[in-house]
């Protein structure tokens, strides 16, 4: 059986933004993917964590820096055929003041870590989601502002 590691943030975790609850397995994109491909000999490993970044350490929520965690997770789940890398949204938080180039450098580091663990691993890179309209307005996540988009 081939394994697909889905490494990401709250979007991979399946966070319901309005309630902070979690979507059930059948609703999360990782669960939907799993159902579609399991009959073809694939197993989906879900590694989503709310607040996870590429290279930034959150001062109030420890162990969110993907670059520190990814090598351990890769080793834990060996052998891995494919990694779906879906990070970068939290890197846009106001506290980090990151440029697109800095976020891109973080993604490059994660890709290097994946290839260092096994040069034959396939990588699917998923772009960070669009934060959408309303960033910086009342009711929107206060960790983001107009400079985050």
Regions found by a protein language model. Give the residues of each.
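A short acidic, helix-capping loop that chelates divalent metal ions and anchors anionic groups
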Residues: 14-17, 52-57, 91-96, 134-136
